[in-house]
Amino acid sequence: MNILAVDTAGKTAGVALLQDDRLLYEVYLDAGMTHSETLMPMIDTCLKMCGMTCADIDLYGVNAGPGSFTGLRIGLAAVKGLAFPRETLCAPVSTLEALAAAHTGEGTVLCALDARRAQVYSAAFDLATHSRLLEDDARAVADLADFVENCKKPLFFVGDGASLCYNKYSNVPGVL
């Protein structure tokens, strides 16, 4: 199965092509919020480098948020435009779930994206089982206190809002 994945939730745009469980190609471009100009050329390059066309794609994965509203719309519109003519399947991917999937080990990972004004888009996952412990939501950093203080496993903060959380909760036992 050939999967083309697109991430436009933040300042960095990303495109990856997987064949079954093997990564064939990935590219990230940190050119600010220029996704409307850079995403389609990134996808085109990805497909050409792998000797494929859109007809070879079995599934599109697209970041569905949280993230930049305009960035998400650009990614969703691009994938819809590529998938619709061939009725190719599309799968939404949570930004926070994707961030958690990049981490393994023992403990809990709390993914946090800076939502400004002392808020974060956040979710938490058990690293060993990848089970969700907190649903995706926008929360005040202070509103995470109950979860952080009652977490029974080592707790790691990841994402561009991690420092906000760590600064608030670094004195809580188990926070690493």
Model-derived features: where do they sit?
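Surface "functional belts" at beta-alpha junctions
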Residues: 22, 89-176
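Buried hydrophobic packing segments
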Residues: 43, 78-82, 99-100
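N-terminal beta-alpha supersecondary unit
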Residues: 1-64
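Residues at secondary-structure transition points
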Residues: 30-38, 69-73, 77, 94
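Glycine/Thr-rich phosphate-binding loops of Rossmann-like dinucleotide-binding domains
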Residues: 14, 70, 165-167
